[in-house]
């Protein structure tokens, strides 16, 4: 049996391709699953950094003694009190259903589906804007500029997520960039396919570096061969037809 290509081994998901658990908080940074009708308060007891995550996390302790980790908003500090519930005040760090958030309010860490604990607008320094309320749901303007309509019961955190500008900091060495990608389980550096051996990549091998075949492959190409221009509508330079 021949040796499997690297792309197939990555698809299998072995330990060498997964992000390490070292430096993790040990639990997901989601909203605690409180009933929607209940009102809870928690105190920020610590601000922690999780490996592979640019935005800091707030360690929150509630009145019943339970502890949860949630993404920290810009300006959060130890000792502050966060409110979770429908009757929470419109202040930074509080978690409220978007049906009770006024139009024009800046929010982050929004639930895509009710009860998922926050799934969108979770990157460092990002925020969204509650645009309007309607019969179909609440319309939110995302950081990309697109609009999405969500369930009014979905929860969101008031404010802008902390850690903005972290992605603008330049990498001073290739090793620093490698460690950053390693913590996130991403591949770095990326080697060109034509520079690899024939058994490693479909574009590899030969007396000189060339693809040797069409670089466009179909959408249903099996793993290992699915490299190059995947389901491309057109490739190459655009030709401008001269008008007669």
UniProtKB/Swiss-Prot annotation:
Pfam families: Ribosomal_L2, Ribosomal_L2_C. The keyword rRNA-binding applies. GO terms for molecular function: RNA binding; rRNA binding; structural constituent of ribosome. InterPro entries: NA-bd_OB-fold, Rib_uL2_dom2, Ribosomal_uL2, Ribosomal_uL2_arc_euk, Ribosomal_uL2_C, Ribosomal_uL2_dom3, Ribosomal_uL2_RNA-bd_dom, Translation_prot_SH3-like_sf. Keywords: Ribonucleoprotein, Ribosomal protein, RNA-binding, rRNA-binding. GO terms for cellular component: cytosolic large ribosomal subunit. It comes from the Archaea. One of its GO terms (biological process) is cytoplasmic translation. The keyword Ribosomal protein applies. Belongs to the universal ribosomal protein uL2 family. One of the primary rRNA binding proteins. Required for association of the 30S and 50S subunits to form the 70S ribosome, for tRNA binding and peptide bond formation. It has been suggested to have peptidyltransferase activity; this is somewhat controversial. Makes several contacts with the 16S rRNA in the 70S ribosome. Part of the 50S ribosomal subunit. Forms a bridge to the 30S subunit in the 70S ribosome. This is Large ribosomal subunit protein uL2.
């Amino acid at each position: 049996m021949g040796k499997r290509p690297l792309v197939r081994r990555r698809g299998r998901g072995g330990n060498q391709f997964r992000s390490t658990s070292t430096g993790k908080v040990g639990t997901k940074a989601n909203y605690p699953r409180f009933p929607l009708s209940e009102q809870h308060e928690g105190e920020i007891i610590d601000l922690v950094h999780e490996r592979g995550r640019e935005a800091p996390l707030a360690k929150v302790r509630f009145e019943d003694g339970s502890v949860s980790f949630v993404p920290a908003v810009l300006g959060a500090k130890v000792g502050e009190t966060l409110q979770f519930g429908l009757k929470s005040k419109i202040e930074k760090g509080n978690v409220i259903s978007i049906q009770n958030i006024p139009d024009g309010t800046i929010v982050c860490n929004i639930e895509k589906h009710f009860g998922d604990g926050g799934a969108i607008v979770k990157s460092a320094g990002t925020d969204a804007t509650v645009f309007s309320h309607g019969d179909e749901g609440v319309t939110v303007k995302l950081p990309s500029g697109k609009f999405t309509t969500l369930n009014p019961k979905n929860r969101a955190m008031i404010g802008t997520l902390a850690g903005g500008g972290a992605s603008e900091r330049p990498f001073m060495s290739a090793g620093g960039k490698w460690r950053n990608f390693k913590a996130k389980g991403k591949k770095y550096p990326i080697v060109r396919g034509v520079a690899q051996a024939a058994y490693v990549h479909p574009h590899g091998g030969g007396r000189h570096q060339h693809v040797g075949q069409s670089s466009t492959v179909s959408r249903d190409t099996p793993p290992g061969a699915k490299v190059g221009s995947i389901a491309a509508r057109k490739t190459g330079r655009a030709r401008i037809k001269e008008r007669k």
